Amino acid sequence: MQISKKMPSPKRTIKVLSALFIGIWLIFIGNGLVLTSAGVMLKEMGVSDVFIGIITSCFFLGGIMSAIFAYSFISSYGYVRSYAIFTALFAISATLHGLGNSIIYWAFLRFLLGFSYYSIVMVVESWINTKSKNEIRSRVLAFYEMLYYGGFGVGVIILALNLSNAKIFAISIFFILLGSIPMNTVKIKEPPLPEKRKLSIPNVFELVPLALSGSFTAGICLSSFFAMSSVFVLKTGGSVLDISAFIFIAMIGGLLSELFFGNFSDKFGRKYSIMLGVFIALVASFFMWFNLENLNILKICVFFLTFGTFSLYALSLARANDMLNNKNESAKVGAELLLSYSIGSLLGPLITGVFIEIFGSLGFVLVYVFILVFLFVFAAFQEVVPKEKRGEFVAKRPSKILR
């Protein structure tokens, strides 16, 4: 008698990891509030646009340091303890903002926020990857992506309440600490400790040039948006409510981007998907250029701006995997793409801050125009991967290497 093997179920996996998902959703809310409110607070403090760019870029510098050091921490202390420690550090970093207004002090705290937040995400995504079978991993990660956009959107809605700085930090800390409760109260079996590994930086530019260029561009576009979009809206004469609406609409565009380009790229290839996304974002950028005084048009344009750019990293990763002859090299390529994205994310706020200081609100748009034109032209001269050699597209933010 043949015994049928039970097929893995995404619903069952999500249910098993429900405490993890609830916790990270609450942390996404806190992070959305902390990240998007920075530009507004620094503007109120009288900080120049250049220094706002420098301070906010420290968040992404912390993310780079997390990619280097957090994995070995998880290998030593396990998932549950690492999650608790990094969540506590995240909450402490948010709390300390109320104790001083020094630029250097804020830059240091932003660094700690970035390090702790990305370390939390590394714990969660590594856990999800370990517990999800290959057949259902993309669907479990898609659910996780929905939580990210939903949580970040709630944080942005809270920002619209126009609260004082103290209340914003208090609410964000509340959600961050609340996010630590499910993991510490529900009995959940954590995965075995990951093996320790040496840090290595592979050299694969000759193999996946479009993927590396795409991930670098994604880093600049996404970090510039999250760090400087609030400053941009203020420069155009908008209010805190306008900032909230602007970012919330952008998040909807980003979510729909993941859904659309997954199917499109599987049918027509990553190169044409990257070019289409860049073209849509470029058209939106030019419309923004000529309508800087009209916030309603800007809110429509930002939907298409993020629709075209928020999937660039996932498309770049899919492109890289399509180009590989030896699939065992995918880990090294993933590390290279993450490094490329991280460098872009560090440079994005710095460049955008300088451009806004020089050109005003137009500077925000010019950064997108220049970098997107470069990527579009570069992509046009790259080869197309045949359909039979393409892998499955997985919606993925460039938060961490998933091992």
Set out the residue ranges of the language-model regions.
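Paired small-residue
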Residues: 104-112, 296-304
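Structural signature of the two symmetry-related core transmembrane helices
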Residues: 81-95, 272-287, 369
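Cytoplasmic helix-loop-helix junction between adjacent transmembrane helices
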Residues: 111-146
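Helix-loop boundary and gating motifs at the non-cytosolic
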Residues: 10-60, 208-214, 222-239, 243, ...
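A late C-terminal transmembrane helix in Major Facilitator Superfamily
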Residues: 327-357
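Intracellular juxtamembrane helix-capping segments at the cytosolic ends
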Residues: 119-132, 310-325
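Helix-to-loop junctions at the C-terminal end of transmembrane segments
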Residues: 66-78, 163, 257-269, 356-357
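Symmetry-related core transmembrane helices of the 12-TM Major Facilitator Superfamily/SLC fold
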Residues: 168-185, 365-380
